[in-house]
Regions:
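Bacterial N-terminal signal peptides
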Residues: 15-29
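C-terminal helical cap
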Residues: 66-68, 391-392, 399, 404, ...
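Metal-associated gating/positioning segment near the N- to mid-region
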Residues: 112-120, 125-190, 215-218, 271-278, ...
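Divalent metal-dependent hydrolysis catalytic cores, especially in the metallo-beta-lactamase
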Residues: 157-178, 195-206, 228-243, 252, ...
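Active-site neighborhoods of metal-dependent hydrolases
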Residues: 223-237, 290-445, 541-542, 547-553
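C-terminal cap of metal-dependent C-N hydrolases
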Residues: 477-536
Length: 553
């Protein structure tokens, strides 16, 4: 093939065009508007007293040079939108007001016009990714005088959440009580405290040790009405009699009438996931009720099994998926039913991970700095829920490894069928950190990181009925996390204080890499890493207090 030699003038024109394109393809300078304030992280890396960091309010905030992941997708599918950028994102009055494209094609079409938006507060997000604020769908918030996390445990927890980009937390029942958390919700909504937005599910039955409250459909409706009067946003069915099928259906129906959705922890009960979905429950937690669909009869419990002995409960739970998976077609039919009914599955895989690798949980790098001492120092204790590893064997871990393999396969299958997945950690002592871990486990299950971000953001707000929290789109509430790195390439960048690079980079260098740099809640900007430094300070104070108390005995 003979190539025509271009005319000299045409060649120069082509060269000029190529030069312009190459120049525009390079990162654009963060052109700060004269008179605007460029927000920069707090200096230093040491812990700082809790209460030091405040939210930054702006009339018009511009996030410059960002790549964003919208968290949105095609309606009726689980297909998520890919990254877009570079862009300038404009936030006004707590809403996303504009997204200005700065890619070479669009900048060339601007023909030199000043297209860069201006603001009174600006963030240089060059090299960073902006995602919608994460939603923790299964928390147990601390608070009140009985909190194991200390008198300011709720403030500490709020900082762990915001420090990891979590802007909405659904509480699934707390020892702090609805009255205490209702006030925290009010203060958070008013912007008077540093906290994520709170969605409060009242746990039922309450107290948990009694079964004579709400044990008929009529009593259940009255109890739900009482929850509404107390200020609950939703209902958490945790044990019997809420597990009685007729009672569950009555509670879910009354909740729906009052604008309250129902979440349920089925445990091993009269109701399974099929019963709960057909009863109108909005959200099914954990794994209970799913593998049972594949059983021919009862699970093969030993004669001396006792469900309320937690070591028995979780030792034999580790064999449940293996038994249920003998009839995968039955479990697949169950998943089809949930998809048809629009029932959400919130699997909380992070909550059980110690069961498959106990040493992993005991050697996490942030245990000494971000975990409260009451969580780190606890030994197996039969009087404490979840503290049952006193005689945990390799055989138990191997059972749970296989359990996870099968469980994750069905989580992936549910998603592939169009099912509504969300992300919750169920680890109230270290919120935020374990939500990131939950998202890693979803990727281990085979989900694409884009899908995982959608699951943890707009899927969750769909379940919660928060239509205005609709991801990154003009008009949506500006709940955002600005990440110092690309979570699609390495989700470890979501861990705060550089812990995603533990053992790879020196301590003094880790903090410069990864982590959520800024968390934005309805337009209010928080220095995420500074909030985690406050959490570190609180852990230090609590550890010193515990040491003093031990020395006085």
């Amino acid at each position: 093939m003979r190539l025509e030699k271009p005319m000299k003038g045409a060649w120069h024109a082509a060269a000029r065009t190529a030069a312009i394109t190459i120049a525009l393809a390079a990162p654009l300078a963060a052109q700060v508007t004269p008179g605007a304030r460029l927000l920069v992280p707090a200096p230093g890396n040491d812990p700082i007293p809790m209460g030091t960091t405040r939210g930054e309010h702006a009339t018009r905030l511009v996030i410059r040079n960002a790549t964003f992941i919208s968290g949105r997708g095609t309606p009726g599918t689980n297909r998520a939108m890919p990254p877009e950028g570079p862009v300038d994102i404009v936030v006004e009055n707590g809403r996303i007001a504009d997204v200005v494209l700065l890619d070479p094609v669009n900048m060339r079409s601007a023909r030199g016009a000043d297209v860069r938006p201006k603001g009174d507060r600006e963030i240089d997000a060059t090299g960073m990714y902006v995602i919608p604020g994460l939603v923790e769908m299964h928390a147990h918030l601390p608070g009140g005088r009985r909190s194991a996390l200390g008198a300011r445990g709720h403030e500490y927890a709020f900082r762990l959440y915001l420090g990891h980009g979590v802007t909405i937390v659904r509480d699934a029942g707390s020892d702090a009580g609805i009255e205490f958390l209702r006030e925290q919700r009010r203060l958070s909504n008013a912007g008077e405290i540093v906290a994520p937005r709170l969605v409060l599910c009242q746990r039922w039955p309450l107290p948990l040790r009694t079964w004579n409250e709400g044990n008929t459909p009529e009593k259940a409706r009255l109890m739900v009405q009482k929850f509404k009067e107390l200020g609950a946003d939703c209902i958490k069915i945790s044990k019997s009699p809420g597990h009685y099928p007729d009672v569950m259906a009555a509670a879910a129906a009354e909740g729906k009438r009052l604008g309250m959705h129902t979440m349920v922890d089925l445990k091993v009960s009269e109701s399974d996931a099929r019963t709960a979905s057909n009863a109108g429950v909005r959200s099914i937690e954990h794994f209970y009720g799913f593998p049972e669909a594949g059983l021919d009869g009862s699970q093969s419990f030993p004669p001396d099994y006792n469900y309320w002995d937690e070591k028995d409960r979780f030792r034999w739970a580790g064999r449940l998926w293996q038994e249920g998976n003998r009839h995968p077609e039955r479990i697949e039919a169950l998943l089809d039913l949930l998809v048809k009914n629009g029932t959400n599955w919130d699997p909380t895989m992070a909550a059980y991970e110690d069961n498959r690798d106990l040493f992993r949980g005991r050697t996490l790098p942030f245990r000494e700095t971000l975990f409260h001492p009451s969580y780190v120092d606890v030994l197996p204790d039969s009087t404490t829920h979840g503290s049952y590893h006193s005689d945990w064997k390799l055989s138990d871990e191997l059972s749970w490894k296989e359990f996870y393999r099968i469980w994750m396969g069905y989580v992936k299958l549910f998603h592939d069928k169009g099912g509504l997945l969300t992300a919750g950690s169920d680890v109230g002592e270290a919120g935020g950190i374990f939500l990131v871990r939950e998202l890693e486990l979803m990727q281990e299950a085979g989900l694409h990181p884009l899908d995982v971000i959608k699951i943890a953001t707009t899927n969750a707000t769909e379940v919660l009925g928060m239509k205005e929290h609709c991801g990154i789109r003009v008009g949506c509430v500006a709940d955002l996390a600005i990440v110092n790195g690309n979570p699609l390439d390495n989700f470890k960048v979501m861990y705060g204080r550089g812990y995603g690079f533990y053992g790879i980079l020196p301590r003094g260098e880790r903090e410069k890499h990864g982590g959520v740099r800024w968390t934005i809640k309805e337009g209010t900007v928080y220095d995420a890493q500074a909030l985690l430094r406050e959490a570190e300070w609180y852990v230090q104070q609590e550890r010193q207090a515990a040491t003093r108390a031990a020395g006085s005995h």
